[in-house]
Amino acid sequence: MTKIYPLMPLRDIVIFPHMVAPLVVGREKSIRALEDAMEKKTEIFLVTQLEPTCEDPNEGEIYQCGTLSTVMQLLRLPDGTIKALVEGQRRARIVSRVPHEEFMQVEVEECTEVLPGQDELIAYERELRKAFQQFAHLGKKIGEEVVVSCSSIEDPVKLANVICSHLPLSSKEKQEVLEVETLGGRIELLLEILFRELQLAEVERKINIKVKQKLSRAQRDYYLGEKIREMQKEIGQGEDGVDEMTELENIIKAKKMPAYARARVQKELKKLRGMPAMSAETTVVRSYIDTILGLPWKKRSKGQLNVLKAEGILNKDHYGLEKPKERILEFLAVQSQVAKLKGPILCFVGPPGVGKTSICQSIAKSMGREFARLSLGGLRDEAEIRGHRRTYVGAMAGKVLRAMQKVGVANPVFCLDEIDKMSTDFRGDPAAALLEVLDPEQNSSFNDHYLDLDYDLSQVFFITTANSLEGIPIPLQDRMEIIQLSGYTEEDKQVIAEKYLLPKQLKANGFQKDDIFLSPGAMLTVVRHYTREAGVRGLERVLASLCRKVARDRLQKGKKSKKYRIGEKSVPTYLGTPKYRYGLAEERDEVGLATGLAWTQVGGVLLQIEVILMPGKGKLTLTGQLGDVMQESAQAAYSYIRSRAKELKLEPDFYEKVDIHVHVPEGAIPKDGPSAGITIATTLASALTGRPIRHELAMTGEITLRGRVLPIGGLTEKLLAAKRGNITKVLLPEENGRDLKDVPAKIKNALDIKLVSHMDQVLEQALLSKGKNK
């Protein structure tokens, strides 16, 4: 009986029935044939080609006998090739070729197994087993596990196929065996090959013995010299008087480590003693021993528990950042009362440049501990965290243990920087590997693949940093104590610039500390109009630029002792035209124009929202590059206004007579989020009723269809934007009232803050009567 199958030609390999083999496939036709077989869940006909170098063999360039095989697994590799795992099933022969556009397809006929008589079959099987075992033990080209596996095979057909697949034969010889029709004939051919190989192996053994006996005098002298040196090492009399092995033994005895680690390193040392000095395995074992001995198993920093001293160090090094400072001082206070306290696992989340990484160093300094840092940005290989298994060439411990080895103590402050910037690929997920590192219940027995021993990380004070929680998996977030760091206010930036950044840049550019002075107004101008960021990195670069401009001016004018006093108006002389401007409150009350408050990664901003009405049929148009959430918020605001038409004294069918256009200026900047809901609703109400909106008022809050005002985030940044934009009155959701305690007093005192819970209260506060424009 014949059947049609896709065909894949093979180079330099013959697949036998019962043989499982991985194949790396690059030819397009072969890939299509594999995918077709996988998709249709059919077998594929694997046959060896006559010339391995032929790229596109035709029917006459392949053998006629092959193996019907099952495609067990397909994996597409980054270079476009496919790795396939196949298992041979039955022998078959090509009957004819069947035309196909994408790959070779043939009609094949399965080969029927012709078995000898029972007694003859038993004799064949015994001889084959005996010859194969002799060959395996004499030639040492076949592993012991293969011999054991073959000894458990009872089916003589399978036994012959498996033995032939493991013999070190050429493709041509294996093809000859595959094509023999009868089982007896195949076993006879195999026995002939095995006996020939046994004779060759015996000849090779005799030749080796003769070569060794004919070693030259110089070689014998070298051999004896090496032996004498080894004997001297055994009695501890090497070149320097102390044998290397003895030195390692002394280090092991002196090293404080757990009993299981000591037992492992002693076992490896014993193995090392019996290895030749020039062996590649010697280097591997020595590196492993050095790794174990280099780890700080029980060595700890003494540290200091003086809370007042720690607070002084933190305040000296960093301005602001109250939340992380408070958490560290709490930890020190508890540690002074508890003998053994597991290190916490903190996660500082905030925009770039606010000092997340640098405060980690200050924390280590304030606690009297060593500091280790590992950048996780761009990490995509799980083995970078857990290490590679020792079976791999060039294997080494993971980055966590290498950092511990470098820092030299078991209780450092360990900063895992940019934890949200890791990625995943076919080599694994580094975030999943960190689950054990950052779990207080598990990290006391962290198991690195290379070390293969439990290592205690429970005394490490882990701090991770991230710009956003979005890139961190939920299970990893659950293991960490999240501390949100907001951007600096303008006042904060001024203080940081005056106390830290400007003195640092003066020193870096060769100035004395009083050579350059910026007035408060000048510093505010630099902060407000030459930087737009949540942190202070850009501010430091601007101050560095100013110092360079002053240095050049001094040199050109020949006045090296001149003191520079820079006022607000002279800043553009050194830094050029201001780069940024911030939104300001409108100068007069307008109909259909309201001021909202938004929060971005670089701080708070004023958000102007405009609405105009046009004769039409009730179409609502939204422009200004609004995101999906903001568009839905606008739809909810519009629906609320329609539901309140009677209270707002609007005609019930007003929406059928006008088209409404809602626009948020600065259309090049994407905008999203629900917090503009009450602002949009107020603007719609103003445009439809003709009542102007107070120009000195700003608002923020999410709206529901029933008019409830829901809480928002980024409160401090939004209020700062209002203060900076000359806003005097702000409407906030009532539920955000509890968050006002975290807002600096100098911001709250400058604003008239009103808490609202319903949209009716917003309209009452925001809308003026008709004709009352100011």
UniProtKB/Swiss-Prot annotation:
Protein origin, superkingdom: Bacteria
Is Ligase among this UniProt entry's keywords?
no
Where do the annotations place ATP binding? Answer: G350, P351, P352, G353, V354, G355, K356, T357
Q: What is its EC number?
A: 3.4.21.53
Annotated GO molecular function terms are:
ATP binding; ATP hydrolysis activity; ATP-dependent peptidase activity; sequence-specific DNA binding; serine-type endopeptidase activity
What the entry lists under InterPro entries is as follows: AAA+_ATPase, ATPase_AAA_core, Lon_bac, Lon_bac/euk-typ, Lon_lid, Lon_proteolytic, Lon_Prtase, Lon_prtase_N
GO CC, alphabetical = cytoplasm
Q: Which GO terms describe its biological process?
A: cellular response to heat; protein quality control for misfolded or incompletely synthesized proteins
Q: Which reaction does it catalyse?
A: Hydrolysis of proteins in presence of ATP
Q: What quaternary structure, including any partners, is listed in this protein's UniProt entry?
A: Homohexamer. Organized in a ring with a central cavity.
What is the protein named? Answer: Lon protease 2
Its gene name is lon2
